[in-house]
Design a protein with these regions (language model features):
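Sec-type signal peptide cleavage vicinity
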Residues: 3, 18-291
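Short, surface-exposed beta-strand/beta-hairpin micro-motifs centered on an aromatic residue
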Residues: 91-93, 229-232, 315, 319-329, ...
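A short, solvent-exposed loop/turn motif at the edges and junctions
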Residues: 110-117, 248-260, 311, 333-359
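N-terminal active-site segment of His-dependent metallophosphoesterases
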Residues: 292, 300, 346-443, 839-842
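Conserved catalytic scaffold of divalent metal-dependent phosphoesterases
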Residues: 299, 371-377, 390-393, 485-564, ...
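Extended active-site neighborhood of metal-dependent phosphoesterases/phosphodiesterases
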Residues: 341-348, 353-367, 441-542, 572-587, ...
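Binuclear metal-dependent phosphoesterase catalytic core
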Residues: 610-723, 727-730, 778-787, 791-808
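C-terminal regulatory/interaction regions
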Residues: 704-842
Length: 842
C-alpha cells in the first residue's frame, strides 16, 4: 500500500433506512441512518529538503476504517465502500441518528482511541508486518484530518524508513529499529488541530520502545552486494544513534535456530524522517569488530549498561544500549555476567542462578549470546546464607541411605525454605562453599554432581555454588579436565555478582593434581594464573571502599591464623591476599576443614607489598558436620570433630554493614554454646567402646587427653563455637559472677562419645588408624564453681546483641542424649524418598 499520505474528504451525505429499537423506558430509539463521506487526495509540492526522499502514497484498501470526531470529542467509525478499494479517493459509510458535525478525522480507527480538545490518544504498534516493495498501512500508518469548506483534509503524521540493508549473506526473519532514549512505537498523542500534525510518542519510562518488522513468512535475502529492502513506519523526527538490528541465517525456510546470526548497525549521525515522506537509509550490517561472541543484556525490554561480561579470561562491559562484544576463543565453552546490583536472574534447575550461557559454535565462528535480568528491587537490605561441605553420598550398594545423608540434608533444605517463607518480604540468597558431593562416592555409590543437582532443586531460592576439592572428578588427572561435570551443571568455576552495595566473588582455589585414581588424588590451595588475571580485571570495576565478600572452599588461614598450607601453596595464598590489598572492606568465607573458626583482623604479611595486611575470614563449619555420621547415632545431635554443630552461617546485610551468626540446623537461632560439667566427664575405652579390640582401643585412647581422667575440681567447660572479637560471656553462680578463663584451642569431649565410638567400637581386623579423630575448637572457656551441686547461669552475647542464656543444673549428665536436647529439639522430619533418575548419572 505505497501511496501518498494526503487526502481531501468531501462530505456527501446519503440517507438510508434502518430498523427501529426501543430504549429501556420503552420509548422508540431514534432510527439509525447511513451517511457517506467521500475522500479526495491532496498533492503536496516537493521542496529541496526532500530531494533525497520519495513521495509517500497510499491507496485505500478493503476494510479500512477512519474515525470521525465531533466538537465534543465523540468518535464515530466510518468504513470504506468496497468499490473504492485500490483508489486514491474513497467513500466511507457511518451510521448515526443524524449527520455528525465533523470537526476532525483520523486513520486508522481501532476503537481504543480517545480525543480531548483535539488531542487524540492512540498507539503505533511495535510489530509491523512486511509487504513486498511497501508496507502494510492498516493499524500502522497514522493520518490526521481537519474539516474545512465542506471536506476533510488528511495529512500524514508519520514517516517511512526505507531500509536498504547489506551485510553477511543471510535470509532475514526479523528486523528491529530503535533509538536510545526515544520511543519509536507505543502510546502517543496526535494533535488533530495542527496544520502539520505529528504523532508524538510518550516519554521513555523504562526501556526505549522500538519497531520490529516480522519477516517470518517472507524472508528477505541480504548479501554484501545486494540490498534487502524493508519499509518501517516511524514517527517523524530527528534521531541520534539510530540502531538497526537483523536476525537471520542461511536457511531460506528455517525458523529460529542456533545458526541465527544477529547483525547490528549504529548510525553515527542524526537521521531526520519527515512526515509524508519515504526516507531511504542505506545500512551495512556488521558484527562488532573481531567479535566471536557478542550480544545484549536486557531487563524486559530495558537495556542494562555497565554489566561485566566475561568468557573467563576476557572481561568487557555493556554499552549504554546494553550491547557487549569480545574476541573470544571461547576457552570455557560459556560466557557469563556479573549480575549487577538491583537485579537477579532466573533460578534454574538445581536452584542454580542462570547467569551464564554455553557457547554452541566453534571458537572462530561468531555467535550472539543475550542475557535476561530480572528487576529485584531494592537490595540494600538482604540476607546471604553460606553453606559449607554438604557431602551428599546417596545410597550404598546394599540400598541403605549412607549416613542418613539425604534425610538429614532434606531437614536442612526444609529449614532454609521455612526461613525464606517466614521472611517473604526479604531478599534472601545462598552460597555453597564447596564439596556438595564427595568424589569417592561418585564411584562407590554412583552418586555424582547431576544427582546432587536434582536434589538441590528443592531449595526455594537462588543458590550460588563454589567449587570444592571433592567436586572434582578424581578419575581425571588434569585440573581443568576434572571439572567437566561442574561446568556442565553449574557453569563457571569462578565468577562474581552484586547484591545491594556488596560485591560477591566465588573463587576456585583448588588446584587439582590427580593421578587419575582414588589413591593418587591430590590438590594444592591457590588460584591459577588464569583466575588471578580474571580476578584483577573483575576488581578493576569495583570501588576501593565497596564491601567485598569472597567465597572459596579452602581457607586462607588455619585455626591458628597461619596460612593453610606451606611451600608453593603459601605463595599462592599470598597472591590471593595481594589481589585485594587496595580494598578496605574484604571478608573471606571458607569451609573445607569441617570445623568452625574465625580469624578476625588477623595480620598477615603481604610478601609482595612487604606490609602486614589484616584478614577477616570466617570458616563456616560443615553442614554435614562429620559427614552426617553423628546424626545416625542421634538425629538431634549432628556434631563436627571440633564439637561445633552442623549448620550454616547467616549474614544479614544493611547497606555496607553486616551482621553474622552461625545457625545450627534444627536448633534455636540463638543456640551459641554447649556447657559441660567436668566432674561428670570420664571417658574410657572400657565404658564407651567395650567391643573394641586392642588396636581400636589404643587408637581411641590416643585422643582422649585429659578427659581420660576423672575430675572433681568443679570446673564447667563452655564451648562457644562462633567466638570472635566482640563476643561476650558471663557466668553467675547465684549472685556471684564467676571468673571466665579462656582455654583457647581445646578438644570438645562430646565428639569423643559420638562418632568416635561408632568408628572404634568394633573388633580388631588388623592395625587401625582413626580417620575421623577429634580436632581442636578455637575457643573453649571454663569457670570454677563453688561445689559439685551448685547451678550456674551462663549468658553468651554475640557482637550484635543476640543472647543465649542457659541455666546449667549440676551435676549434669554427660551423654549424647543429654546434649541432643540442647538448643531445642529439631522437628521430626519424614525421610524423603529421593528417586534418583538413572539417566542423570554420567
Amino acid at each position: 500500500m505505497l501511496k501518498r499520505l494526503s487526502y481531501i474528504l468531501a462530505a456527501l451525505l446519503v440517507l438510508c433506512g434502518c430498523s427501529k429499537e426501543n430504549n429501556e423506558n420503552g420509548a422508540p430509539k431514534p432510527e439509525l441512518q447511513t451517511f457517506t463521506v467521500a475522500a479526495v487526495i491532496e498533492r503536496v509540492q516537493d521542496v529541496r529538503a526532500n530531494l533525497d526522499e520519495a513521495t509517500l502514497e497510499v491507496l485505500w484498501q478493503k476494510g479500512d476504517r477512519i474515525g470521525l470526531v465531533d466538537a465534543k470529542g465523540n468518535i464515530t467509525p466510518a468504513l470504506l465502500d468496497d468499490e473504492d478499494a485500490g483508489s486514491a479517493s474513497g467513500r466511507f459509510e457511518y451510521q448515526a441518528a443524524s449527520a455528525i458535525d465533523i470537526v476532525y478525522a483520523y486513520y486508522p480507527y481501532t476503537g481504543s482511541e480517545t480525543c480531548t480538545s483535539g488531542k487524540l490518544s492512540m498507539s503505533l504498534p511495535k510489530v509491523q508486518a512486511h509487504a513486498s516493495e511497501g508496507f502494510v498501512a492498516a493499524n500502522t500508518l497514522i493520518m490526521a484530518g481537519k474539516y474545512s469548506d465542506g471536506g476533510l483534509t488528511f495529512r500524514n503524521a508519520c514517516s517511512v524508513a526505507q531500509l536498504n540493508i547489506k551485510g553477511q549473506e543471510s535470509y532475514l526473519r526479523k528486523i528491529q529499529i530503535r533509538c536510545p532514549g526515544l520511543n519509536l512505537s507505543g502510546e502517543g498523542t496526535l494533535d488533530l488541530s495542527s496544520d502539520n500534525p505529528r504523532f508524538i510518542t510518550g516519554e521513555v519510562t523504562d526501556a526505549s520502545a522500538g519497531v520490529e518488522v516480522n519477516l517470518a513468512s517472507d524472508r528477505l535475502h541480504m548479501t554484501s552486494s545486494e540490498a534487502a529492502t524493508a519499509y518501517v513506519v516511524l514517527p517523524a523526527g530527528s534521531y541520534n544513534g539510530l540502531i538497526v538490528e537483523t536476525l537471520g541465517n542461511t536457511d531460506k525456510t528455517g525458523t529460529a535456530s542456533d545458526s541465527d546470526v544477529s547483525l547490528i548497525y549504529k548510525s553515527s549521525k542524526s537521521v531526520t524522517f519527515n512526515a509524508g515522506r519515504v526516507r531511504p537509509l542505506n545500512v551495512t550490517m556488521t558484527l562488532p569488530q573481531n567479535a566471536t561472541v557478542y550480544g545484549r543484556v536486557l531487563c524486559g525490554e530495558k537495556p542494562v549498561s555497565g554489566v561485566a561480561v566475561t568468557d573467563g579470561g576476557n572481561l568487557v562491559t555493556t554499552d549504554t544500549d546494553g550491547y557487549y562484544s569480545m574476541s573470544s576463543a571461547k576457552p570455557h565453552g560459556m560466557v557469563y555476567i556479573s549480575i549487577p546490583s538491583g537485579y537477579t536472574v532466573r533460578r534454574g534447575y538445581g536452584s542454580v542462578p542462570e547467569f551464564y550461557r554455553y557457547t554452541v559454535k566453534e571458537a572462530t565462528v561468531p555467535e550472539r549470546i543475550d542475557f535476561e535480568l530480572i528487576d529485584d528491587g531494592d537490595q540494600t537490605n538482604h540476607t546471604m546464607l553460606l553453606i559449607g561441605d554438604i557431602h551428599l553420598m546417596g545410597y550404598n550398594s546394599n540400598g541403605n541411605e549412607a549416613n542418613r545423608n539425604l534425610t538429614q540434608f532434606n531437614a536442612l533444605v526444609n529449614e532454609i525454605n521455612r526461613y525464606v517463607a517466614d521472611n517473604e518480604d526479604s531478599k534472601i540468597y545462598a552460597m555453597t562453599l564447596g564439596d556438595m558431593t564427595w568424589d569417592s562416592y561418585w564411584i562407590w555409590n554412583n552418586f555424582r554432581i547431576p544427582d546432587y543437582v536434582q536434589i538441590s532443586d528443592k531449595f526455594n531460592l537462588n543458590v550460588f555454588c563454589t567449587v570444592g576439592n571433592h567436586d572434582n572428578d578424581l578419575t581425571v588427572a588434569e585440573d581443568w579436565a576434572c571439572m567437566a561435570d561442574w561446568r556442565r551443571y553449574y557453569g563457571p568455576t569462578y565468577y562474581s555478582f552484586n547484591i545491594g552495595q556488596v560485591h560477591y566473588i566465588s573463587l576456585d582455589n583448588v588446584i587439582t593434581k590427580n593421578g587419575g585414581t582414588i589413591e593418587t588424588r591430590d590438590y594444592n590451595c591457590g588460584l591459577t594464573d588464569q583466575i588471578l588475571t580474571w580476578l584483577k580485571k573483575d576488581l578493576a570495576l569495583v570501588d576501593k571502599d565497596t564491601p567485598i565478600v569472597v567465597a572459596m572452599h579452602i581457607p586462607l588461614l588455619n585455626i591458628s591464623g597461619g596460612t593453610s598450607m606451606s611451600g608453593d601453596n603459601d605463595m599462592k595464598t599470598y597472591k590471593i591476599i595481594d589481589a585485594f590489598f587496595d580494598y578496605s572492606d574484604v571478608t573471606y568465607f571458607s569451609a573445607h576443614s569441617h570445623t568452625l573458626y574465625n580469624n578476625y583482623g588477623e595480620e598477615v604479611l603481604n610478601l609482595n607489598k612487604f606490609r602486614y595486611q589484616p584478614i577477616n575470614e570466617h570458616n563456616v563449619g560443615a553442614a554435614c558436620a562429620d559427614f552426617w555420621a553423628s546424626g545416625t547415632i542421634n538425629k538431634d545431635l549432628l556434631i563436627s570433630r571440633d564439637g561445633s554443630p552442623g549448620g550454616y552461617r547467616i549474614m544479614k546485610v544493611s547497606g555496607k554493614s553486616r551482621q553474622m551468626t552461625f545457625k545450627a540446623t534444627g536448633k534455636d537461632k540463638n543456640y551459641f554454646f554447649r556447657a559441660y560439667d567436668r566432674n561428670s566427664i570420664h571417658i574410657t575405652a572400657e565404658k564407651y567402646i567395650p567391643k573394641a579390640g586392642p588396636n581400636h582401643k589404643a587408637e581411641y585412647e590416643r585422643y582422649l587427653e585429659e578427659y581420660a581422667d576423672a575430675s572433681s575440681d568443679n570446673y564447667i567447660y563452655i564451648h562457644v563455637w562462633d567466638w570472635y572479637e566482640g563476643w561476650n560471656i558471663s557466668v553467675k553462680e547465684g549472685s556471684k559472677t564467676l571468673t571466665v578463663e579462656d582455654l583457647g584451642k581445646y578438644k570438645d569431649p562430646l565428639y569423643m562419645i559420638s562418632n568416635m565410638v561408632r568408628k572404634c567400637n568394633v573388633a580388631d581386623n588388623g592395625s587401625y588408624t582413626l580417620d575421623m579423630f577429634p580436632l581442636n575448637c578455637q575457643h573453649m572457656f571454663r569457670v570454677k564453681a563453688s561445689s559439685a551441686t551448685s547451678s550456674v547461669t551462663i549468658t553468651v552475647t554475640d557482637p550484635f546483641g543476640n543472647i543465649d542464656v542457659q541455666e546449667i543444673k549440676r551435676p549434669r549428665v554427660f551423654s549424647v542424649e543429654e546434649y541432643a536436647a540442647d538448643g531445642g529439639v529439631r522437628t521430626k522430619y519424614v525421610a524423603p524418598s529421593f528417586e534418583l533418575d538413572p539417566e542423570m548419572n554420567l
